[in-house]
Swiss-Prot record:
Disulfide bonds: none annotated. This is NADH-quinone oxidoreductase subunit D. InterPro entries: NADH_Q_OxRdtase_suD, NDH1_su_D/H, NiFe-Hase_large. Its EC number is 7.1.1.-. Belongs to the complex I 49 kDa subunit family. It catalyses: a quinone + NADH + 5 H(+)(in) = a quinol + NAD(+) + 4 H(+)(out). Keywords: Cell membrane, Membrane, NAD, Quinone, Translocase, Transport. Pfam families: Complex1_49kDa. It is found in: Cell membrane.
């Protein structure tokens, strides 16, 4: 009871007093000649989610300013696409957010298909959604595991990568690759599912649904250290999240029920029953709850895909040489980190005139500059876990 009362008091104080009140009073600073400290964190740092550099200004252990510096993994992806044929761009998208390869391929193919006006076979649409939801699980669970690992807990990351490994085995059986799939193609998918895979996936999600509570929820939510390190950290309001253009779990953890799958439906999502998971706290703990509940929703979607998937072809009427008419195509999907959108401009040739990617990791990184100040230095890792950026996404 005392612990709950203490927590309630701390939350009340946090609501009344902004985090910046931890800073040393300016009068005291002038009297004693105190100075802030500039410190670099990264780009080579095991907890930076990739090649990211944070320039920090510290007042003791309190963050005064945080400037993210990106570009260490920039590969000119959009420019390279201008010199590739339309199908040859698909392998490049796998190298963007490498924890959401299927979603990247799907978003790009939707944009080109928008230009072509091609009809996708129903079976291919269900296979696309099936693969993307497996990919979402294979991203969310490691994200949770990484968050706990950065807080000092080792066991959840082992359970998370056990599940990711099993899903990658399915990907390998279907696509021939474990990460860079090149599976979703313009007009459909590369190949049909092997005959034994649907039953194996069904058995897997049945077992996963039973394992989530003991292996993740019970292990994490009863951990006092996790609660102390995540509750109230980087608390976002709905207005702040919308103003920053956040999408995905960082937005939905504030209570904004925006999901591209429902609000701008694509593929066969309108035919599937699922809930848009939200929370109201807007902090790191809330983002964890959103991700773990979305795993349950992905399991629900996977079951429906396996039940409703019709027989038939898996590729539409698209020639080997793709040459869309002049114009612009747009595709958007709901990736694990938020809205992934692709804008393709065609000049009538077999190579794109312009390709632009809107990756959620890049947009959501704005949160660091806005919400880091006022928090303590050790809070950087939980806040990074809220954003869950991937360097292949923010650097294209």
């Amino acid at each position: 009871m005392l612990r709950e009362e203490r927590r309630a008091a701390e939350e009340a104080i946090t609501l009344i007093r902004p985090a910046t009140s931890r800073l040393v009073d300016p009068d005291i600073r002038d009297e004693f000649g105190l100075e802030t400290l500039d410190m670099n964190m990264g780009p080579q740092h095991p907890a930076m989610h990739g090649l990211l550099r944070l320039i920090l200004e510290l007042d003791g252990e309190t963050i005064v300013r945080c400037d993210p510096v990106m570009g260490y993994l920039h590969r000119c992806q959009e420019k390279i696409a201008e010199n590739r044929t339309y199908p040859a761009v698909i392998p490049l998208t796998d190298r963007l957010d490498y924890f959401a390869n299927m979603h990247n391929e799907h978003g790009y193919c939707l944009a080109v298909e928008d230009l072509l006006g091609v009809e996708i076979p129903p079976r291919a649409e269900y296979i696309r959604v099936l693969m993307c939801e497996l990919m979402r699980i294979a991203s969310h669970l490691p994200s949770i595991g990484f968050l706990l690992l950065e807080l000092g807990a080792f066991t959840p990351i082992l359970y998370a990568f056990r599940e990711r490994e099993r899903i990658q085995n399915f990907f390998e059986a279907v696509t021939g690759a474990r990460m860079m799939f090149h599976y979703i193609r313009i007009g459909g998918v590369k190949a049909d599912l092997p005959p034994d895979i649907p039953e194996k996936i069904w058995e897997y999600v049945e077992g996963l649904e039973k394992r989530i509570k003991p292996d993740f929820i019970d292990l994490i939510e009863g951990n006092e250290i996790f609660i102390e390190r995540t509750r109230g950290i980087s608390r976002l309001t709905q207005e702040e999240a919308i103003e920053l253009g956040l999408t995905g779990p960082p937005l939905r953890c504030t209570g904004v029920a925006f999901d591209v799958r429902r609000d701008y439906p694509y593929s066969v999502y309108p035919e599937l029953d699922f809930e848009v998971v939200t929370d109201t706290a807007g902090d790191v703990e809330a983002s964890y709850r959103v991700r773990i509940k979305e795993v349950y929703e992905s399991i629900k979607i996977i079951r429906q895909c396996l039940e409703k998937m019709p027989e038939g072809e898996v590729m539409g009427d698209v020639g080997r040489r793709v040459r869309p008419p002049e114009g612009e195509g747009f595709g958007r999907v709901e990736g694990p980190r938020g809205e992934f959108a692709v804008h393709v401009v065609s000049d009538g040739s077999d190579t794109p005139y312009r390709v632009h990617y809107r990756d959620p990791s890049f947009v959501n990184m704005q949160l660091l500059q806005e919400k880091m100040p006022g928090h303590y230095l050790p809070d950087i890792m939980p806040i990074m876990g809220l954003v869950d950026p991937v360097s292949g996404g923010w650097d294209k």
